[in-house]
Amino acid sequence: MPTINQLVRKGRSPKVAKTKAPALKNNPMRRGVCTRVYTTTPKKPNSALRKVARVRLAGGIEVTAYIPGVGHNLQEHSIVLVRGGRVKDLPGVRYKIVRGSLDTQGVKNRKQARSKYGAKMEKK
């Protein structure tokens, strides 16, 4: 516990909040180029083959980004839009690829939550 005199001399330093997506540099989204597209397995107790991509962002930073939805058309040198948002069962994956923008196609035959997966409204 500081004395009044110590507080007068130094004051209290404000707590600095650490960002959860540092590679985006305070932007909501960032453009990048896929350097590698592959699958990984989640940590226990889950079991699957999660689709992820290694992306070199516009600032030159390389991040691992998750590809959401069923099926994708991404390959090496695809230009993608990356947003923040971690995948809980994949350690080190703190970013997601935005579906339906740039080279990424939206999810086919998607009826619900379409805006999250870049799916257009189905024609009647």
UniProtKB/Swiss-Prot annotation:
GO terms for molecular function: rRNA binding; structural constituent of ribosome; tRNA binding. PANTHER family: 30S RIBOSOMAL PROTEIN S12 FAMILY MEMBER (PTHR11652). With S4 and S5 plays an important role in translational accuracy. Interacts with and stabilizes bases of the 16S rRNA that are involved in tRNA selection in the A site and with the mRNA backbone. Located at the interface of the 30S and 50S subunits, it traverses the body of the 30S subunit contacting proteins on the other side and probably holding the rRNA structure together. The combined cluster of proteins S8, S12 and S17 appears to hold together the shoulder and platform of the 30S subunit. The lineage of its organism: Bacteria, Bacillati, Actinomycetota, Actinomycetes, Micrococcales. GO terms for biological process: translation. Residues 105-124 are annotated as: Disordered. It comes from the Bacteria. InterPro entries: NA-bd_OB-fold (IPR012340), Ribosomal_uS12 (IPR006032), Ribosomal_uS12_bac (IPR005679). HAMAP family: Ribosomal_uS12_B. It comes from Renibacterium salmoninarum (strain ATCC 33209 / DSM 20767 / JCM 11484 / NBRC 15589 / NCIMB 2235). The gene is rpsL. PROSITE patterns: RIBOSOMAL_S12. Belongs to the universal ribosomal protein uS12 family. The keyword Glycosyltransferase does not apply. The modification 3-methylthioaspartic acid is found at residue 89. GO terms for cellular component: small ribosomal subunit. Keywords: Methylation, Ribonucleoprotein, Ribosomal protein, RNA-binding, rRNA-binding, tRNA-binding. Part of the 30S ribosomal subunit. Contacts proteins S8 and S17. May interact with IF1 in the 30S initiation complex. This is Small ribosomal subunit protein uS12.
